[in-house]
Swiss-Prot record:
Subunit text: Interacts with ZSCAN10. Interacts with SOX3 and FGFR1. Interacts with GLIS1. Interacts with POU5F1; binds synergistically with POU5F1 to DNA. Interacts with DDX56. Interacts with L3MBTL3 and DCAF5. The interaction with L3MBTL3 and DCAF5 requires methylation at Lys-44 and is necessary to target SOX2 for ubiquitination by the CRL4-DCAF5 E3 ubiquitin ligase complex. Interacts with RCOR1/CoREST. Interacts with PHF20L1. The interaction with PHF20L1 requires methylation at Lys-44 and Lys-119 and protects SOX2 from degradation. Interacts with TRIM26; this interaction prevents ubiquitination by WWP2.
Taxonomic lineage from the root: Eukaryota, Metazoa, Chordata, Craniata, Vertebrata
Biotechnology note: POU5F1/OCT4, SOX2, MYC/c-Myc and KLF4 are the four Yamanaka factors. When combined, these factors are sufficient to reprogram differentiated cells to an embryonic-like state designated iPS (induced pluripotent stem) cells. iPS cells exhibit the morphology and growth properties of ES cells and express ES cell marker genes.
Any one GO MF annotation of this record: chromatin DNA binding
Inducing stimuli: By SRRT.
Protein name per its UniProtKB record: Transcription factor SOX-2
Function: Transcription factor that forms a trimeric complex with POU5F1 (OCT3/4) on DNA and controls the expression of a number of genes involved in embryonic development such as YES1, FGF4, UTF1 and ZFP206. Binds to the proximal enhancer region of NANOG. Critical for early embryogenesis and for embryonic stem cell pluripotency. Downstream SRRT target that mediates the promotion of neural stem cell self-renewal. Keeps neural cells undifferentiated by counteracting the activity of proneural proteins and suppresses neuronal differentiation. May function as a switch in neuronal development.
UniProt crosslink position (Glycyl lysine isopeptide (Lys-Gly) (interchain with G-Cter in SUMO)): 247
DNA-binding residues: 43-111
InterPro entries, per the entry: HMG_box_dom (IPR009071), HMG_box_dom_sf (IPR036910), SOX_fam (IPR022097), SRY-related_HMG-box_TF-like (IPR050140)
Tissue: Expressed in the cochlea (at protein level). Expressed in the brain and retina. A very low level of expression is seen in the stomach and lung. Expressed in the kidney.
Motif (9aaTAD): 274-282
GO terms for biological process, alphabetical: adenohypophysis development; anatomical structure formation involved in morphogenesis; cell fate commitment; cell fate specification; cellular response to cadmium ion; cerebral cortex development; detection of mechanical stimulus involved in equilibrioception; detection of mechanical stimulus involved in sensory perception of sound
GO CC terms in record: chromatin; cytoplasm; nucleoplasm; nucleus; transcription regulator complex
């Protein structure tokens, strides 16, 4: 087994040597390519006016500045060429025309075939986003992964850059950023749940209380049942009349309801006549009979009547 591993590990050495030889071959190929460029068999393009002018100027500038790079010399020569007037460019343009005519005469079958230069873009140049969203070298995510605070800071910076890129205002976007930033902290989830519990408790208690009052109103055969539907705009009156009936029952009731029954019972006398005359079967009876019905309703509300059914429910004889 170790022998097999040794035999498997040995070949990379010669391969590296062969790779170096391949590199040497590539170097030789490049050298041959350079030789082909400089070879007399290769037909060059005729020089244009700028090349005719820059041929002497380049040599002169290279002698004056021996440490200057060729690309910098080309930039300066191009800037100087643009500053020249047409009269100064004219002799070089004429010389370029003469060289072109001579080139066409010597090489009638010549056709310029430009070779496409493939520009290899770097990774960060390919995927860079506007506004500097990615840090140089792609280290923004790597620096923020270790610590949660660092990740939140990197996210906030990127969100700010997104906000400026999309044209959002700082005020409106900061609210959204705060909403997104709160759940990042692990301790805030339990705190948020603890804050949400009292609200749910209040809602459930209110629902239970409403269901209790509605069920008690439905079970009692009293004018409260008709009054709760006749006048929905006065919930205090309905609550007060219901409290008086619940007080007469044997079951326990909330103390708030009983206190409201004493405070709001006098307000009901004026409106009971209209409601009873509207919803009771004897509504067609003339007006003098209404006080008797009002007295009967108040008698039922005051206390339990002997001979009634279980739990103090009121009889329906007045119907």
């Amino acid at each position: 087994m170790y022998n097999m591993m040794e035999t498997e590990l040995k070949p990379p050495g010669p391969q590296q040597a062969s790779g170096g030889g391949g590199g040497g071959g590539n170097a030789t190929a490049a050298a041959t390519g350079g030789n082909q460029k400089n070879s007399p068999d290769r037909v060059k393009r005729p020089m244009n006016a700028f090349m005719v002018w820059s041929r002497g100027q380049r040599r002169k500038m290279a002698q004056e500045n021996p440490k200057m790079h060729n690309s910098e010399i080309s930039k300066r020569l191009g800037a100087e060429w643009k500053l020249l007037s047409e009269t100064e460019k004219r002799p070089f343009i004429d010389e370029a025309k003469r060289l072109r005519a001579l080139h066409m005469k010597e090489h009638p079958d010549y056709k310029y075939r430009p070779r496409r230069k493939t520009k290899t873009l770097m990774k960060k140049d390919k995927y860079t986003l506007p506004g500097g969203l990615l840090a140089p070298g792609g280290n923004s995510m790597a620096s923020g992964v270790g610590v949660g605070a660092g990740l939140g800071g990197g996210l906030n910076q990127r969100m700010d850059s997104y906000a400026h890129m999309n044209g959002w205002s700082n005020g409106s976007y900061s609210m959204m950023q705060e909403q997104l930033g709160y759940p990042q902290h692990p301790g805030l989830n339990a705190h948020g749940a603890a804050q949400m519990q009292p609200m749910h408790r209040y809602v459930v208690s209110a629902l239970q209380y409403n269901s209790m009052t509605s069920s008690q109103t439905y079970m009692n055969g009293s004018p409260t049942y008709s009054m709760s539907y006749s006048q929905q705009g006065t919930p205090g009156m309905a609550l007060g009349s219901m409290g008086s009936v619940v007080k007469s029952e044997a079951s326990s009731s909330p103390p708030v309801v009983t206190s409201s029954s004493h405070s709001r019972a006098p307000c009901q006398a004026g409106d009971l006549r209209d409601m009873i005359s509207m919803y009771l079967p004897g509504a067609e009876v003339p007006e003098p009979a209404a006080p008797s019905r009002l007295h009967m309703a108040q008698h039922y509300q005051s206390g339990p009547v002997p001979g009634t059914a279980k739990y103090g429910t009121l009889p329906l004889s007045h119907m």
